[in-house]
Each structure stands twice: as C-alpha cells, then as structure tokens.
Amino acid sequence: MQNKKSYRPNVAAVILSSKYPEKCEFFVAHRTDIRNAWQFPQGGIDEGETPEDALYRELLEEIGCNNVEILGEFPEWITYDFPKTARGKVYPFDGQTQKYFLVRLKEEAQINLQAFEIPEFKEYTFVKYDELFQKVTYFKRKVYRRVIDHFIKEGLI
C-alpha cells in the first residue's frame, strides 16, 4: 500500500516594487538557511486563518513589512513537492499547496529583513521578469512562471 502524500497549506507573495507600473520589478530574497536559494516570501496558514490574513502575517514576519496593496489572487491552489533532499528536514510534509497573491509595495513601505528574531532572509533584490527565473531556486521556477504568466494574461502586470 502506498502512503498518501501530505502537503502544507501555504501562501506566497509575488511582490512588485512601489515603482510599478512605471517600472516592473519583482522582489526576491535569499534564504538564510539554504545556500543560493532565492524565492518569494511565503509561509504556512495557521489554523483559523484566512489565506489573506496569512499573507499579511507572513509578509510582516519575513520582510518586516505588510504595507502592500493586493492586486490579484491566483484562482487555484498550486501544489508542488519538495526536492527529495529536503523532504522531512524542516516539516513533516512532502511539499506545499499554495495560494499566490500579487501585491505591490506601497510608496512608504520599508523592508526590514531583521524585523524578527530569526530572519528568514539575509538579503533581497528587485529583478526584471527575464532575470527572475535565473535567480530563483530551480524547483520553484515552473510554478513562479505559471503564476506570473497568469497575472500578465489577466492584465494585472
């Protein structure tokens, strides 16, 4: 008999800089715990929390700022498996099922990666669309492209 896979409910934020729409740049951050792993902010949904509530909480925890405007929400939950080398190391899950939001930093937003005791990220940058997929960790590229291309198709980016 095969074991059923388990997936962690999660939210993820595709963050556009406050310069959008004049300049289209995506926020990506370098994880503190994994070498060369760049990604979007994301995190688990706590019991009783809505995905939108989790989004605001996770942004505050991970980048020290939830001063954003929500521009869109991906219509589906996207599930992906962790790489085999990572499974079971941090969470007892095989992967994550994620709800993606497209957000824009407000003009007065201030990012502070040191806002919490144990920082999730050590540095961040803003990149253009064509640079994004070279920068982010390999196993997230397909999902990121699907989500961003959807937002582009919908006219949100």
UniProtKB/Swiss-Prot annotation:
Annotated GO MF terms: bis(5'-adenosyl)-pentaphosphatase activity; guanosine-3',5'-bis(diphosphate) 3'-diphosphatase activity
Motif Nudix box, residue range(s) on this chain: 43-64
Cofactor(s) the protein requires to work: a divalent metal cation
GO terms, biological process: nucleoside phosphate metabolic process; ribose phosphate metabolic process
Domain Nudix hydrolase span(s) in chain numbering: 6-149
EC number, UniProt record: 3.6.1.-
Xref: CDD domains: NUDIX_Ap4A_hydrolase_plant_like
PANTHER family the UniProt entry points to: NUDIX HYDROLASE 26, CHLOROPLASTIC, UDP/ADP-SUGAR PYROPHOSPHATASE
Alphabetical list of HAMAP family matching this protein: Nudix_RppH (MF_00298)
NCBIfam families: PRK00714.1-3, PRK00714.1-5
Protein name per the record: RNA pyrophosphohydrolase
The species this protein was found in: Sulfurovum sp. (strain NBC37-1)
Gene: rppH
